[in-house]
Amino acid sequence: MHILEKKVRDAVAAGRYALIPFLTAGYPDEDAFWEDMGDLDKNGADVIEIGVPFSDPVADGPVVENASRQVLADGMSLARIMQGLRDHQGFFNAGLVLMGYMNPFLQYGFEKLAKECEEVGVSGMIIPDLPYEEAAPYRETLKKHGVALIALVGPNTSEERMKLYADVSEGYIYVVSVMGVTGERSSVAPAVVSTMERARRCFRQPLALGFGLCHP
């Protein structure tokens, strides 16, 4: 069992939902970010998703977009994130996931990134702009280093496509609650129920619901 799947299943076995918070790397500043990471880890986060800032975050709403813009202006980069993880190696009990877009990952060097993820304790990656049809070589590169490529499915994902993801996915499945971008909504969309029902029929992997959540 992949370590991320175990983190989520251990939470469920303890009678609770897994807590998987997201932080934009370097926000509001680098020191505060690592302090926030530690606070989340100490206070029960099962997995922490680290947002890699990018200048054109097409899946993100204004909150994440503005945070990314600020930290990029302050000099945050994937190289600095990896160095920070190296400096904090062994510090976190929570599973660690990088969430970001292909452009900075390719610029960094995907094979190099996968190897360094293994070295610093990153167990998964979420790449919203990497479609299933193009993902196989990147998934295999990550798998060699014990890093899961987390699949994203949503209201418009057919059961047939979900089953394709089910055959190759590790860790957990990221279920997008709404069409559109990240950010708080006043309520959860009614379509979430049917999306989760379809996902439960297709996946043996645990499901994590994200996008548009305003409370646990």
Please state what every model-predicted region is.
Residues M1-I20, L85-Q89:
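N-terminal amphipathic alpha-helix/helix-capping segment at the start of soluble metabolic enzymes
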Residues D10, G61-V97, E140-G154, P190-L207:
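Alpha-helix-loop-beta-strand connector modules within alpha/beta enzyme cores
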Residues L19-L23, I48-I50, L96-G100, M125-I127, ...:
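Hydrophobic faces of well-ordered beta-strands that scaffold small-molecule active sites
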Residues Y27-D29, N43-S77, Y132, V176-R185:
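Glycine-rich, proline-tolerant flexible connector loops at the mouths of alpha/beta enzymes
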Residues E30-L40, T157-V168, F203, L209, ...:
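Catalytic cores of alpha/beta
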Residues V47, V52-F54, V63-P128:
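Active-site beta->alpha loop and helix N-cap motifs at the rims of alpha/beta catalytic domains
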Residues V64, D74, M162-R201:
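Glycine/Thr-rich beta-alpha phosphate-binding loop at enzyme active sites
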Residues A73-M76, G121-E134, A148-T157, K163, ...:
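Catalytic beta/alpha-barrel core
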